[in-house]
C-alpha cells in the first residue's frame, strides 16, 4: 500500500463513526487485514471499512462504470426519470466488487453504485491452472469456474501467461480489477445484456471460493487467496 493511500485510510479512520460491530472492530484496530473479514465470515455493511482496509480501490483507475441506463416510471404525477448505473471496483490484486446505483442525476447514481460495489466486494482465488503454462504465478484462475445470472452463463478457463483476457469488454474490466490477467472464456445466453453478463462474470469469480483446495493443489497451481502479497494496515 502506497503512503498516499495509507494517509487516505488514516483520514477516513479519524473522521469515521462506525455504526456496526465490524466497523467498531476495524476502528479500534482489532481487524487490520481485509482477509480476516472474509476468513471470519463477516458481512460488510459500511463502505468506510473498505476505505480503511482497501483504500486503493478509490483510485480512479480501480473504478469502472460498466453501464448507464435511463429508466422511466409512470406515477400519478407523471413520468419519473432516473438513472441506473452499474459499477465495479477492485484493487487489481484479488479483490473486486460489483454494485448498482439509482439516482435522479448520473453523478449521484455513480457514487451510489461505487458504494454498493464496496459493500459487495469479494475475495477470490487466483493461480496458474493452465496446462500450457504451469508457472505457479497468480495470473489466471486456478481451475475452470462458472457463473450464471438470468439467461447468461459464463465459464472462465485458466490461460497461459501472455494470453490476455479472451472475453467481452465488460468481462475484461471486471477481471482486470480482480487481478486476473490471462483467461479463456465460454459464454452462453443473451450476453448483450450488460448487467446479467457482468453479474455472471462476477459470480464465476466468487465461485473460485466454492472449490475446496488441498496443499498439493496450492503448491501445483500457485494458488493465492486475495492479495498475492498480503499486507496489514498500519498507521505508521
From Swiss-Prot:
GO biological process: translation
Keywords: Ribonucleoprotein, Ribosomal protein, RNA-binding, rRNA-binding
GO molecular function, one term: structural constituent of ribosome
Superkingdom: Archaea
A Pfam family that the UniProt record links to this protein: Ribosomal_S5_C
Domain S5 DRBM: 61-124
GO cellular component: cytosolic small ribosomal subunit
rRNA-binding is among the record's keywords: yes
UniProt KW Endoplasmic reticulum keyword: no
Domain comment in the entry: The N-terminal domain interacts with the head of the 30S subunit; the C-terminal domain interacts with the body and contacts protein S4. The interaction surface between S4 and S5 is involved in control of translational fidelity.
Family note: Belongs to the universal ribosomal protein uS5 family.
Cited function: With S4 and S12 plays an important role in translational accuracy.
PANTHER family referenced in this protein's UniProt entry, alphabetically: 40S RIBOSOMAL PROTEIN S2 (PTHR13718:SF4), RIBOSOMAL S SUBUNIT (PTHR13718)
Known partners and oligomeric status: Part of the 30S ribosomal subunit. Contacts protein S4.
Protein known as: Small ribosomal subunit protein uS5
Native source species: Pyrococcus furiosus (strain ATCC 43587 / DSM 3638 / JCM 8422 / Vc1)
Amino acid at each position: 500500500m502506497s503512503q498516499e493511500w495509507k494517509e487516505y485510510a488514516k483520514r477516513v479512520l479519524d473522521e469515521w463513526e462506525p455504526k456496526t460491530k465490524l466497523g467498531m472492530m476495524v476502528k479500534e484496530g482489532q481487524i487490520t487485514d481485509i482477509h480476516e473479514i472474509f476468513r471470519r465470515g463477516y458481512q460488510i455493511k459500511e463502505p468506510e471499512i473498505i476505505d480503511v482496509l482497501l483504500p486503493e480501490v478509490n483510485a480512479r483507475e480501480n473504478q469502472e462504470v460498466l453501464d448507464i441506463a435511463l429508466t422511466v416510471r409512470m406515477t400519478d404525477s407523471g413520468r419519473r426519470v432516473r438513472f441506473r448505473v452499474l459499477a465495479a471496483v477492485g484493487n487489481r490484486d484479488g479483490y473486486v466488487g460489483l454494485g448498482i446505483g439509482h439516482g435522479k442525476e448520473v453523478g449521484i447514481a455513480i457514487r451510489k453504485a461505487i458504494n454498493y460495489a464496496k459493500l459487495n466486494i469479494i475475495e477470490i482465488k487466483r493461480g496458474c491452472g493452465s496446462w500450457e503454462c504451469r508457472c505457479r504465478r497468480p495470473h489466471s484462475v486456478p481451475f475452470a469456474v462458472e457463473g450464471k445470472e438470468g439467461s447468461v452463463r459464463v465459464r472462465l478457463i485458466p490461460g497461459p501467461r501472455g494470453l490476455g483476457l479472451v472475453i467481452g469488454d465488460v468481462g475484461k474490466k471486471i477481471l482486470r480489477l480482480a487481478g486476473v490477467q490471462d483467461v479463456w472464456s465460454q459464454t452462453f445466453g443473451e450476453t448483450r445484456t450488460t448487467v446479467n453478463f457482468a453479474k455472471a462474470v462476477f459470480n464465476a469469480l466468487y465461485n473460485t471460493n466454492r472449490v475446496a483446495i488441498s496443499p498439493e493443489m496450492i503448491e501445483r497451481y500457485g494458488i493465492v487467496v486475495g492479495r498475492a502479497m498480503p499486507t496489514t494496515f498500519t498507521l505508521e
